[in-house]
């Protein structure tokens, strides 16, 4: 066998492996998309005759003809918005401190990083138990209110926001800050004017995805007194509330078949909200990326 034959054989083997790998990736993507669209089609097929204005403007009810999701939608908006207001600034500033100002390798930083990584993997129901013991009852005693639920969801998404923000800040080329420091800028000026704006695309995308996770949570809120049927919209952090995932669960667990279709409609509404948040994250990332390039 000549060297040319050996080279051709190796080239053919590589092409086969490359084609096999590409085929496997394509099949995996198609399988994932097929599953997602299959779920969406199933929900649409069950609820297409219910997707009217009434399903959004009506309050939850034991009468399937007048049942809707107005208070769960407003409750989810209240809870998730307050959680984002609390978690996002704290998470981004913590990530900024750990990446730019904390001492590398000291014991405090290592302990803090380890705990943040561990908290990111804690089940949501554990955060609910902590909130029940220390926020709804216990030292704070806020009761079963929107504020209690928002604080628990903020604790739940905070580690994710910190980790994503750190990765985004770490991805900024070091030459940006080094150039600013060489021109006489202070470390804070370099971070505020160069590092932080350059990390906005990744930070914003990760933060919105973390908020999307909070939007779909129900387990911790079950422990915090979220009601199943609320016929009023929350008016502030001290109001009682319900959320969209919990209302969907309540309708789906009813023995009457009509409520199962209503639960499918609620699931489709939740998916639309989550897809909208993901779309906002993509558009915001693209906009900030183009702005930084200019």
Q: Language-model features: where?
A:
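Periplasmic/extracellular loop-to-transmembrane helix junction in inner-membrane transport proteins
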Residues: 3-24, 42-83, 105-106, 250-261
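Transmembrane alpha-helices
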Residues: 84, 164, 187-225
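Interhelical loop and adjacent transmembrane-helix boundary motif
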Residues: 60-63, 67, 221-271
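Transmembrane-helix boundary motif in ABC transporter permease subunits
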Residues: 83-116, 129-132, 137, 282-290
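C-terminal transmembrane helix and the adjacent membrane-cytosol boundary/short C-terminal tail
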Residues: 98, 166, 170, 174, ...
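Generic hydrophobic transmembrane alpha-helix motif, especially the helices
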Residues: 117-157
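Membrane-embedded alpha-helices of multi-pass transport/permease systems
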Residues: 34-37, 41, 89-96, 126-129, ...
């Amino acid at each position: 066998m000549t060297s040319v034959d050996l080279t051709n054989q190796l080239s053919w083997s590589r092409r086969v492996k490359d084609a096999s790998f590409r085929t496997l990736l394509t099949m995996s993507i198609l399988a994932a998309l097929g599953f997602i669209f299959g779920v969406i089609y199933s929900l649409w097929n069950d609820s297409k005759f219910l997707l009217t204005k009434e399903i959004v403007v009506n309050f939850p009810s034991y009468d399937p003809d007048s049942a809707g999701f107005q208070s769960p939608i407003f409750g989810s908006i209240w809870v998730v918005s307050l959680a984002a207001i609390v978690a996002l600034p704290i998470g981004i500033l913590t990530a900024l401190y750990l990446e730019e100002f904390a001492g590398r390798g000291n014991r405090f930083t290592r302990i803090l990083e380890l705990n943040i990584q561990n908290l990111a993997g804690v089940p949501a129901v554990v955060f609910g138990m902590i909130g029940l013991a220390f926020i709804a009852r216990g030292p704070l005693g806020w009761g079963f209110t929107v504020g209690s639920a928002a604080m628990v969801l903020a604790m739940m998404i905070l580690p994710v926001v910190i980790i994503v923000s750190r990765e985004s800040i770490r991805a900024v080329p070091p030459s940006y800050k080094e150039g600013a420091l060489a021109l006489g800028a202070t470390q804070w000026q370099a971070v505020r004017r160069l590092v932080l704006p350059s990390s906005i695309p990744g930070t914003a995308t990760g933060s919105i995805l973390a908020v999307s996770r909070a939007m779909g949570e129900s387990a911790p809120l079950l422990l915090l007194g979220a009601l199943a049927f609320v016929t009023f919209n929350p008016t502030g952090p001290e109001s009682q509330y319900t959320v969209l995932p919990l209302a969907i669960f309540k309708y789906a667990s009813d023995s009457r078949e009509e409520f199962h279709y209503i639960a499918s409609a609620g699931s489709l509404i939740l998916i639309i909200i989550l897809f909208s948040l993901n779309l906002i994250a993509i558009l915001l990332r693209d906009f900030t990326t183009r702005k930084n390039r200019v």
